[in-house]
């Protein structure tokens, strides 16, 4: 049936029934688009990057001084494993490239956390793949403080989103 012959409700129903023929490739394209959207929410983090709060003073400096030993060092009473791992990798880069690396790593963590919703494990909860794409977009676009957006400080927040989504997901079909 040509597209012009379908009613609006039929087109909406078709969107709801959409299932990608290549789910992994489709998810990768959607996550890549999400990365671009994440970066466009605060372009100054990429065009004029800088270290924010603990990013430089705590994570980066301690990574330089203590090396990988800083990864398991608590800060303010709890471990910051992922931010410290990112800082450990960033400590091998020139100082001028470190803030940009931190911003890109933070964006990758954000879209990866939200990208979990695209998994087949969410089919029982949200059967429509199109609806899962919408939820992915809504998670990425949720309002938050711009000053910590695309910084290592926001990484733990995105880990919380990933943990919450993992709790909602269906059990994996393979081990």
Question: Which role fits each region the language model picked out?
Answer:
Residues 75, 101-105, 145-156:
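Membrane-embedded glycan-lipid processing machinery
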């Amino acid at each position: 049936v040509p597209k012009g012959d379908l009613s609006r409700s039929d087109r909406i129903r078709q969107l709801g029934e959409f299932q990608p023929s290549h789910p992994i490739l489709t998810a990768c394209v959607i996550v890549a688009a999400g990365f671009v959207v994440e970066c466009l929410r605060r372009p100054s983090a990429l065009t004029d990057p800088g270290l924010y709060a603990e990013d430089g003073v705590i994570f980066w400096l301690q990574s330089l001084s203590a090396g990988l030993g800083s990864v398991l060092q608590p800060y303010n009473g709890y471990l910051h494993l992922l931010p410290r791992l990112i800082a450990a990798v960033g400590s091998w880069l020139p100082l001028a490239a470190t803030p940009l690396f931190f911003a890109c790593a933070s964006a990758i963590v954000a879209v990866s956390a939200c990208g979990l919703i695209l998994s087949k494990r969410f089919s029982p909860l949200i059967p429509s793949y199109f609806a899962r794409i919408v939820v992915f977009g809504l998670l990425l676009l949720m309002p938050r403080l711009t000053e910590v957006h695309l910084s290592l400080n926001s990484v733990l927040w995105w880990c919380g989103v990933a943990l919450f989504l993992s709790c909602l997901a269906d059990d994996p079909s393979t081990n």
